[in-house]
UniProtKB/Swiss-Prot annotation:
It catalyses: a 1-acyl-sn-glycero-3-phosphate + an acyl-CoA = a 1,2-diacyl-sn-glycero-3-phosphate + CoA; a 1-acyl-sn-glycero-3-phospho-(1D-myo-inositol) + an acyl-CoA = a 1,2-diacyl-sn-glycero-3-phospho-(1D-myo-inositol) + CoA; 1-acyl-sn-glycero-3-phospho-(1'-sn-glycerol) + an acyl-CoA = a 1,2-diacyl-sn-glycero-3-phospho-(1'-sn-glycerol) + CoA; 1-hexadecanoyl-sn-glycero-3-phosphate + (9Z)-octadecenoyl-CoA = 1-hexadecanoyl-2-(9Z-octadecenoyl)-sn-glycero-3-phosphate + CoA. This is Lysocardiolipin acyltransferase 1. The gene is LCLAT1. A motif (HXXXXD motif) lies at residues 85-90. It is a multi-pass membrane protein. It holds the Pfam family Acyltransf_C.
Length: 378
């Protein structure tokens, strides 16, 4: 049954992303045609302000507790984050961890392409340059390569979240994973799915070659009580009471360089996850005996609390302010309508704002190369 908590959560996130895309991100869209690097720098920080809202709602309104154990992050470092995909919402819950131990503005997520069509959420994800995939490697490889080369070219640090399992853990996906294991003589898993290593190895190789990778963060996520498997569970008010993250940091120098060894390395991490999660769910429902966060965060809890309070206040007032603006001023209504048309039309015509941004960067890069060639001839 749909609950008021779920409705409040979804409506608050939607209004924030919808009006934020139009009134906060929209004015900066022309900047991508002048300087894609500056456009990326500014919009990453604007999007990060919205990413604090789900964190604030989950913890301050719905009382979710976050526990982080393991190695933690070095603030500002460039990394690939690999995580088990227990629910469809793991990527959002990870923001509760990153707010404390890293910087939300650095995160990019690899997501299925259908999500970019969602008004508000999808528009903001396009502006944030998330990597949208079709889940067909022959179609995704060139897009992956172009986006990763872009991030390397502009020297903007990123922490790229990918789910090697490819989908969340359900009875159906576990059955398919077990069929795969049986055909290939592998162990059947109970708490994770067998990882698909092709995309992972490609991402690591690309970022490594572009000198844009400091470490790999292997994160195991678990929910000791209620598990919100889908968006419907959140709408029904089934929010996680506790979210546990166990972080293992591997400096890139310690990670294998060959493709075959990297595949085995990833598979080994999943074997460890299976055992770690087995101990978690069959034992004391914690990754560490204390059941408490043991990693010193890069931000104090007082600072995190201040960020959450400001976020909750701002994203409550902001939609009301935009409603008032639209009611009082005709130019705001014209701008509002124009931006909706632009967001919808550009995706129909060009496929997404991240592709336009990428094309602009490639154009400027080509022009720079042409100018450099002319200078050398002189």
């Amino acid at each position: 049954m749909v609950s008021w908590k779920g409705i409040y959560f979804v409506v608050a996130l939607f209004l924030g992303s919808f009006f934020g895309s139009i009134f906060m991100l929209g004015p900066f869209l022309p900047l991508m045609f002048i300087s894609p690097a500056w456009y990326r720098w500014i919009t990453d920080r604007i999007v990060a302000t919205w990413l604090t809202l789900p964190v604030a709602l989950l913890e301050m309104v719905f009382g979710a507790k976050v526990v982080v154990t393991g190695d933690g992050f070095i603030p500002g470092e460039r990394s690939v984050i690999i995580m088990n995909h227990r629910t469809r919402m793991d990527w959002m819950f990870l923001w509760n961890c990153l707010l404390r131990y890293s910087y939300l503005r650095l995160e990019k997520i690899c997501l299925k392409s259908s999500l970019k069509s969602i008004p508000g959420f999808g528009w903001a994800m396009q502006v944030a340059a998330f990597i949208f995939i079709q889940r067909k490697w022959e179609d995704d490889k060139s897009h992956f390569e172009n986006m990763l080369h872009y991030f390397c070219d502009i020297h903007e640090p990123l922490q790229l979240l990918i789910f090697p399992e490819g989908t969340d853990l359900t009875a159906n996906t576990k059955a398919r994973s077990n069929d795969f294991a049986e055909k290939n003589g592998l162990r059947k898993y109970e708490y994770v799915l067998h990882p698909r290593t092709t995309g992972f190895t490609f991402v690591v190789e690309c970022l490594r070659e572009g000198n844009n990778l400091d470490a790999i963060h292997d994160i195991t996520v678990a929910y000791p009580q209620n598990i919100p498997q889908t968006e419907k569970h959140l709408l029904n008010g089934n929010f996680p009471k506790e979210i546990h993250f166990h972080v293992q940091r591997y400096p890139i120098e310690t990670v294998p360089t060959s493709k075959e060894e990297l595949q085995l390395w990833c598979q080994k991490r999943w074997e460890e996850k299976e055992e770690r999660l087995r101990r978690f769910y069959e034992g004391g429902k914690c990754f560490d005996e204390t059941g408490q966060s043991i990693i010193p965060p890069c931000k104090s809890e007082l600072r995190v609390l201040a960020v959450k309070c400001i976020s909750l206040l701002y994203w409550t007032v902001f939609p009301m302010g935009t409603f008032a603006l639209l009611y009082l001023y005709s130019f705001a209504r014209w701008y509002f309508a124009a931006m909706i048309i632009i967001f919808v039309a550009q995706q129909k015509i060009f496929g997404g704002l991240e592709l336009i941004e990428l094309a602009c960067h490639q154009y400027f890069k080509k022009q720079q190369k042409h100018d450099d060639t002319k200078m050398k001839k002189k």
